[in-house]
């Protein structure tokens, strides 16, 4: 067994958060077990004794990796929690599937010395699933027929809404539930503007960096910190093998950009791409269990000249690949001309479209231009076609957009794409901060999330500079969890403020450990506190190093409340009386300003 296989066995799978426990809420059947993270709190200490603080239940996308009772074995993969739900519907079948070929991993022969040896250990009897002839297995199809699936009930419990509300949003196309029937390990989640704003984390190897072990660990790391979906954007060798390990161990939906792998199969020469190579790649990834595909079918031949005067041209990798193909052959984009056939594949496995914005602006100078909005019109057209097949759709958006132009993007998308979920990369609100683009983009992400975007694609500090490592992934996920939560608060999402209120109360009561534990990144919060006040006693002190004991505003506020209670006054009366006492004290001292 190779060294890299040993590395895979020894991956650093993360434990649970401090003072937290995994809790499961059971649905109408015993196999619907919806995970949450329960954060325990310490009691409030008062003069009259202790008052209990209720634990806070929060949304949890980390899968069983943070369940201390679960024994991790990534060579086995996660439990197939949806398998029985899928099979009992009776509308799918097992079949032989396609054989894995050397070109699937970017090689010309099986014995290439660069080929990964750690093929995921599937049993010899494993066969992929597909819809039976004439059947449609999409969650949208079931929703339109009035069927509430176990997946829909699972999501309803997660979101604290009714199953019927979930079904209705899916039927209308205002939400998607990405759930390939060949990814039964995934815990159902929903993407739509009437639900929690979700975030996606991009991972994937490249031709110059990263390994399978690192990408699997990055996936578990990203979901630990709160990624709701993962996109595997691998562009180097061993793409198929890397993706298999990720999907089998991913508790969240996995998306891809199939054109990247198709390009590898033709040795990186865009003009050599064909519909046949691309179609084969779609089926390959569908059989593995990819839940949504980014497909750049809106990059039409007539739109390409509209980018000629841009500052940054076409910045989407997929968009530039298709533009090059169109110009070389002077033909229409084959993803557009074969879109109906793609829909047939999507509904055979229940894969959602993520209609790619191949002409998104790559600089604020290019924001909201003719090319961007021309493509959006085509994406609206394609959305309607997909819905005719009952295929789930979300639409991708920019990009680089200054703050005053963000709302126009959201309004146009809702109108043109008939309220299909919007999935945006940021947008970045300024171009002057390489190394800090997780911040420049989070500003735009919070705004567009408030206006109605359903999912935000994270940006890490390495954006435009290099491939993110584990620390960058953590930074990007946390930054985008902040943006998504801020949007939930602004939209008035039920229950969104409960965690904020609990943390604020803990802060006012100087329950330092509860402050840390209720935060999005408990480790970082405690680390910063302990840089200046590391002693254990500082965890109960009524001040921090920012103001010190004499100038802590919250301690002073508490003193005012204590004074009011002792004097039998309310807080405003206590302040007034205190001011009067100080005035009398000033007069009795002679009324001199300086003494």
From Swiss-Prot:
It comes from Halalkalibacterium halodurans (strain ATCC BAA-125 / DSM 18197 / FERM 7344 / JCM 9153 / C-125). Its EC number is 4.1.99.17. This is Phosphomethylpyrimidine synthase. GO terms for molecular function: 4 iron, 4 sulfur cluster binding; carbon-carbon lyase activity; zinc ion binding. GO terms for cellular component: cytosol. Its cofactor is [4Fe-4S] cluster. Binds 1 [4Fe-4S] cluster per subunit. The cluster is coordinated with 3 cysteines and an exchangeable S-adenosyl-L-methionine. It catalyses: 5-amino-1-(5-phospho-beta-D-ribosyl)imidazole + S-adenosyl-L-methionine = 4-amino-2-methyl-5-(phosphooxymethyl)pyrimidine + CO + 5'-deoxyadenosine + formate + L-methionine + 3 H(+). Pathway: Cofactor biosynthesis; thiamine diphosphate biosynthesis. It holds the Pfam family ThiC-associated.
